Amino acid sequence: IVLRVNSPGGSALASDIIWRETELIKVSGKPFYVSMGDYAASGGYYIACNADRIYANPNTITGSIGVFGVIPNLKEFLDQKIGITFDRYETNPHADALSLFKPLDTLERSAMNTMIAQIYNEFTTKVASGRRMLQSEVDSIARGRVWSGEDALEIGLVDELGDLNACVAAAAQKAGLTEYRRVDLPEMVDPLEKLIKDLEGNRSKTILSLVLGEDFNAYRGAYDWINMEGPQARLPFIMQLR
């Protein structure tokens, strides 16, 4: 099995669920190779680190082994931009600990930091196991640091520099296959169908941007943060190419 990873990361929970599936692949005895695309960062590397061999391009954004959590405080945004205010009634002092409409207090911040530290420890433990390194060695190149594919090769985060075809050929050789055909999953979406869906999505965004005007970007950013579930293992920035 060759897993193609082209991801800046995402939910720590989702990354761990996918990692477990890679562990089941290894238990089955099948060769498990990973080919990295433009990036395999944070959660993207989390799901790759368990592979028998990892291939990357020289410029693949690799690593960013780290975790962060964000609970946005939208109180002022909703009050000043949209005119929505909230009144809270609680059954205990921390019943609304994850509320988006107030800042975190000292105890809530401490609990959040503890949870993030636990997830980071689990992350580095898995990388150390998959890459046959000491956890202290992983920590020395982790903590959110980003590496190129070439640098990642030197520090042991990847095994080879090569594209997807090179990775597939190596996996086939490892499996003892002289003749094989590649099956890509999931199946490619029909281009016309994808175009129609994209146009429908763009229409909704266009209407919303006309209604909100200059507040649209702020709304879209708030919407993205609200929909993040739990601690995140992802790049600590968003790249926009213009």
Task: Annotate each PLM feature.
Residues S35, Y89-T91, V183-E187:
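Conserved beta-strand termini and adjacent loop/short-helix elements that scaffold enzyme active sites
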Residues M115, P186-R242:
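Intrinsic disorder and flexible/low-complexity segments
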